[in-house]
């Protein structure tokens, strides 16, 4: 009988990898539904396209590596990678953007390092950053929430915009939002960053229609949806509490300090917690067991570092949201964090 020799850690769990990946994917449903409700059918279309591309890319690499298809495709890791990347991409992005991103995530960020369990960086976020740097216009073309749209975008319009670049009536994404008051193609975080650079105060910026709520129209409920999904993951013990709690606590504390000393040029801690990809990042991205810290103390440092980096990038960086960059930078620090936080071997003195 042939036995497979695997490397450590030899962790044991009642839940298989297939089941865990499936449950994490299911936990995204509240956030996915909220994102679809406020930003249209494009979200679901991108998710479907990304999942199909991820499975095909996974099969392609497995064939090239002469690995059996069924065991690896059934673990649902490719499905989850495609899903998470699709949730971060603007809903009406061109189809080729999603295909390129997913292909990079699976082939380069995952399998180039050896496959599942060997990757140094979170594949979905590595792909997101590559897309953001390579195609900044397409990656920052977000529709405002549906309440602000003058023209209704139907399911078929979404299909045409994604695969043809124009709606059924021949309008581009920019043309469909030309009559929207305020900054139409930007997220609330982008609107804040642009407004502050123009010399406006935070209160003046938040008076724009896109801020019909303390975290931006639509984005509040999207983050609430991912928060609910994250609580489900904690309840099912699929993730450790250390990373999301330290991530959110760090972001809250730092943003609170700056809000106290400079209220006219900074946003509130609640705004930071419920804007952009905060909750998606805290519960679904940063908690990736492969690329995150492995000790409990290390997870606290790791999560706190991400929260700090998110605020720094949002406030002083070149991009409005910093979750992807923060996670990748923290991934680079994981070996150092694990080295200095590894527990003392039983029976040995510290030092």
From Swiss-Prot:
EC no.? 7.-.-.-
> In terms of one coarse class, where is the protein primarily found?
membrane
Q: Membrane topology for this entry?
A: Multi-pass membrane protein
Q: Where are the transmembrane segments?
A: 37-57, 88-108, 123-143, 214-234, 241-261, 270-290, 300-317
The record's annotation in InterPro entries points to: NqrB/RnfD, RnfD_bac
Q: Name one GO cellular component term.
A: plasma membrane
Instruction: Give the record's GO biological process terms.
Output: electron transport chain; transmembrane transport
- UniProt-listed HAMAP family: RsxD_RnfD (MF_00462)
User: What family does this chain come from, according to its entry?
Assistant: Belongs to the NqrB/RnfD family.
How does this chain assemble?
A: The complex is composed of six subunits: RnfA, RnfB, RnfC, RnfD, RnfE and RnfG.
Q: What NCBIfam families does the annotation carry?
A: PRK00816.1, rnfD
User: Could you tell me what this protein is called?
Assistant: Ion-translocating oxidoreductase complex subunit D
Tell me which species this is from: Aliivibrio salmonicida (strain LFI1238)
């Amino acid at each position: 009988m042939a036995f497979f020799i695997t490397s450590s850690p030899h962790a044991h769990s009642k839940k298989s990898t297939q089941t865990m990946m499936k449950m994490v994917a299911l936990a995204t449903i509240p956030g996915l539904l909220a994102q679809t409700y406020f930003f249209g059918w494009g979200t679901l279309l991108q998710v479907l396209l990304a999942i199909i591309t991820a499975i095909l890319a996974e099969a392609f690499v497995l064939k090239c590596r002469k690995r059996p298809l069924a065991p690896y495709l059934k673990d649902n890791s490719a499905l989850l990678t495609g899903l998470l990347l699709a949730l971060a991409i603007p809903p009406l992005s061109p189809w080729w953007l999603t295909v390129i991103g997913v292909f990079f995530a699976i082939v380069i960020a995952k399998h180039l390092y050896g496959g599942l369990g060997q990757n140094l960086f979170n594949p979905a976020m590595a792909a997101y950053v590559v897309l953001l740097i390579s195609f900044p216009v397409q990656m920052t073309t977000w529709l405002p929430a549906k309440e602000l749209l003058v023209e209704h975008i139907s399911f078929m319009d979404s299909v045409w915009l994604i695969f043809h670049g124009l709606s059924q009536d021949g309008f581009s994404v920019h043309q469909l939002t030309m009559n929207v008051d305020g900054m139409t193609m930007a997220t609330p975080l982008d609107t804040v960053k642009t407004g502050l650079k123009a010399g406006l105060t935070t209160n003046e910026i938040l008076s724009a229609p896109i801020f019909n709520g303390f975290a931006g129209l639509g984005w509040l409920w999207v983050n609430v949806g991912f928060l609910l999904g994250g609580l489900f993951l904690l309840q099912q013990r699929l993730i450790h509490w250390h990373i999301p709690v330290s991530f959110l606590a760090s972001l809250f504390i730092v943003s609170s300090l700056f809000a106290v000393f400079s209220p006219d040029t900074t946003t509130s801690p609640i705004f930071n917690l419920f804007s952009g990809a905060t909750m998606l990042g805290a519960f679904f991205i940063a908690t990736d067991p492969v690329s995150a810290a492995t000790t409990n103390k290390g997870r606290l440092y790791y999560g706190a570092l991400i929260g700090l980096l998110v605020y720094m990038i949002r406030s002083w960086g070149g991009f409005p949201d910093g979750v992807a960059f923060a996670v990748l930078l923290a991934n680079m620090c994981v070996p150092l964090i694990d080295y200095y936080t590894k527990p003392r071997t039983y029976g040995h003195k510290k030092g």
